[in-house]
Amino acid sequence: MYKRQPKNKPEIVNVPKANYIAVRGKGNPNEEGGAYQQAISVLYAVAYTLKMSYKTDYKIEGFFEYVVPPLEGFWWQDDVVGVDYTNKSAFNWIFVIRLPDFISKADFNWAVETATKKKKLDCSSAEYLTIDEGLCVQIMHIGSFDNESATVALMDTYLDQNGYVNDINKDRLHHEIYMSDARKVAPEKWKTVIRHPIKKA
């Protein structure tokens, strides 16, 4: 589903429509036991229920074994252009995990119900979300999330030089794809794809 990782310099891409498991929330993602950590638990519970469905009596049409894709996040703050990393408590977010094309809404509903029962975890916050990102600029950011502003500045300069402008709004959001496990990798080595919606200037 993700054939290659972006380069550490800006590139323009046309992102096709895709389906995701999604959980929405608000607040500081670093809060111990907060909404973010609960959302991640729900996402992975549903994702792995779908991945391992072939070992159950439930059969998904067209299923083949696959690797669960990386975690992704869409971020925004009310009345703020871009993202202000100094005010993490004001974050609104949608965390997602991409689904293979063969997984239907009915399959998703089965997984939510099954994960809730088997893992004794309320997964009702999960939703089946279709996202059509379209024209975007993206780059591989290396390092802490708090240092993303310098990488975003590189993206904005690239857009200006190539006749594009940022198109972040209430429907098209700042997007991050987390290629590293933050629990196992030092912050200075974290790999995060940053993706912004764009349009012609």
Describe these PLM feature segments.
Residues 3-201:
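A solvent-exposed interaction/effector surface
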